[in-house]
Amino acid sequence: MKIIVRILILAEFAAIVFIPAAYLPRWALIPMFASMIGLVVLYWFAMFWVSRKDVEKVLGKAPEHDFYVGKLPADPSADLTRGRLCVTDGRLVLMQRTDDGERRQTPCREAWSRNVDEVTSVGFGKVLPARTGFILYYGDDEVRFTCAKAAKDKTIVYNALGWPVPETSEGN
């Protein structure tokens, strides 16, 4: 599916860029751009989206709390690890989408995990120059996640960790 979507995006881009304006009417450009944006969104879902149903299939039960995040890597030149952060049985587990060949057997895999008890504190704010999220602190270590939903409503992170929501916290 990803290959087909890539080819369609490339073909549509080539049509818009390389077909002379005399042969391509203006009214056709807007639907072409709209369908290209739709194809890019479809490609993103095919590459990164992990549904709650996929997580239930792999873990064998529904997670207590879950939300879609991007985990920042330790190496700044690497890409985000995108997936669904789940809290189940006292563990934080980041489930990442598997490749197409493996998807029928296991739609997602565990990319990162940690015990909830190890979290010493939580911080909210900008984790990248253009992205908000939250930071989980483990003593001297920290793990950063991008998640606009969690940055806006901090209670979901506190509830997921099983902590009381502070009165001074914004977004209650």
Where does each model-flagged region fall?
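Anionic N-terminal interaction surfaces
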Residues: 1-6, 13-16, 25-90
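Eukaryote-biased RCC1-like beta-propeller repeat architecture
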Residues: 19-21, 109
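Eukaryotic phosphoinositide-binding membrane-targeting regions
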Residues: 43, 65-76, 151-168
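A general alpha-helical scaffold signature found inside nucleotide-binding enzyme cores
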Residues: 60-64, 114, 152
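Generic detection of short hydrophobic beta-strand segments and adjacent strand-loop junctions
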Residues: 65-72, 112-114, 143-145
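Phosphoinositide-binding peripheral membrane targeting modules
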Residues: 75-84, 88-134
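Canonical phosphoinositide-binding patch of PH/PH-like domains
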Residues: 135-159
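Disordered regulatory linkers adjacent to lipid/PI-binding modules
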Residues: 171-172
